[in-house]
């Protein structure tokens, strides 16, 4: 009997989750397949890649134009949220990475004498993706098996219940500042 694969089979799409825009790109690859029945070129959504803290792009997906943005760094996330709230921008899909450059630039990464290597690391993730024989999340045999044996099909009731979440606004907790005054935190 073959050994278990405790970490599973990875796809190139999974690898690029560590770079800003990677989660979006992986999702768009599979969304294109689900919408059209055929895979796009794996690099069709490369326009969203890069080190810029706020990237925008438009893609045609199944005859519709999809407006997307990917931001990294909390300052850029704040700018994006404010622009959305003020109606300055409109997107169909947004990715936010807290760390500049995505997880490749996160606090758990080694620091090289103060050099910022997130862009270089992100580039390496895309090289690993390009070399992977499985470039699409939906082609991962373990993901396919999970759907066949348990979830049913993408967007099935069970898959939706277990894999999707909804978000509604919540009131931020009260805080006490250095003068002892209580204040409410709220997005301005």
Residue ranges and their predicted role:
Residues 1-188:
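Iron-sulfur (Fe-S) cluster-binding modules
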């Amino acid at each position: 009997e073959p050994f278990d694969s405790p970490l599973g089979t990875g796809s190139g799409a999974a690898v690029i989750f560590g770079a800003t825009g990677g989660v979006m790109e992986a999702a768009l690859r599979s969304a294109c397949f689900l919408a059209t029945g055929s895979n796009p070129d794996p690099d069709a959504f490369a326009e969203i890649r890069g080190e810029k803290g706020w990237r925008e792009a438009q893609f045609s997906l199944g005859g519709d134009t999809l407006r997307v943005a990917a931001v990294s760094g909390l300052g850029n996330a704040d700018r994006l949220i404010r622009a959305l709230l003020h109606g300055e921008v409109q997107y169909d899909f947004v990715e936010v990475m807290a760390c500049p450059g995505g997880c490749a630039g996160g606090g758990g990464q080694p620091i090289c004498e103060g050099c910022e290597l997130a862009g270089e690391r992100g580039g390496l993730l895309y090289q690993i993706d390009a070399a992977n024989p499985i470039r699409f999340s939906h082609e991962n045999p373990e993901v396919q098996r999970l759907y066949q044996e348990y979830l049913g099909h993408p967007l099935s009731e069970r898959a939706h219940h277990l894999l999707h979440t909804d978000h509604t606004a919540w009131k931020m907790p009260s805080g006490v500042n250095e003068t002892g005054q209580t204040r409410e935190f709220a997005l301005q």
